[in-house]
A protein has these predicted regions:
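Active-site cradle of extracellular carbohydrate-active enzymes
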Residues: 1-20, 24-25, 37-92
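Terminal, non-catalytic domain-edge segments
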Residues: 27-52, 79-85, 89, 96-218
């Protein structure tokens, strides 16, 4: 048979696919309900899979000018480098998927020095990558359709972009033509309104990080 092709063969963090599986494996490994009936051998297999998954997470954490940052939504399964998925999902740093990845790492018991470094680096990236003074608002456009746009908001909490450039860390947007753009208004109506381009996922990272620091210091 031909080798499988397409982005779905890559390491996929997009839409929390891998992290959801890792959470499931953790429940199996811990014998959490409804997996209490599973034998010890199955629980051990789940733990081995978790260990491999964590190793993969650490290998795929992107370095930007020699500094650990966060993750792309998908990575090449051979090289671990950031990879393209759909036409509008270019290799990048993800301000969405990376949140749940680092939160997962913070939930590990007895984290290694490498895991701790990974967490600290990712949290610092979230701090450095805050987008302040904006919000996403709905409005009725000139065609009478409900639309979305970026608007100023000095009192709003920080936001994070779905995609940041690998080299510059600049937030960007992209339409189905695969062309990178830097303003939400520059992409078409369908993608502008059909994708989560900006989010506040970093808030959950900060909350979990505060609790994690307390646990680590004990």
């Amino acid at each position: 048979r031909d080798s499988p092709k397409g982005y779905y063969v890559q390491i996929t963090y997009n839409d929390n696919a891998m992290i959801n599986v890792m959470n499931l494996l953790r429940d199996v490994s811990n014998g959490k309900s409804p997996f209490t009936y599973l034998p010890e051998s199955t629980r051990q297999k789940a733990q081995k899979a978790i260990d491999k998954g964590v190793e993969c997470i650490l290998k795929t954490q992107v370095k930007q000018h020699g500094k650990l940052t966060v993750w792309c939504a998908q990575h090449d399964r051979e090289t671990f480098a950031p990879a393209k998925a759909r036409a509008y999902e270019l290799p990048s740093l993800s301000g969405a998927e990376s949140a749940n990845i680092v939160i997962y790492l913070m939930q590990l018991t007895n984290p290694s020095a490498e895991v701790i470094q990974s967490i600290e680096s990712a949290v610092q990236w979230f701090k450095d990558s805050e987008i302040k003074g904006i919000k996403i608002e709905s409005f009725i456009n000139k065609d009478g359709k409900k639309d979305r746009r970026v608007a100023p908001c000095e009192d709003c909490k920080p936001m994070w972009a779905r995609f940041y450039e690998l080299e510059t860390n600049r937030p960007f947007f992209c339409d189905r033509d695969g062309i990178k753009r830097y303003h939400l208004s520059e992409i078409g109506y369908e993608r502008r309104n059909g994708y989560s381009w900006l989010n506040r996922s970093g808030e959950n990272v900060y909350k979990e990080y505060a609790q994690w620091q307390k646990r680590i210091r004990k």
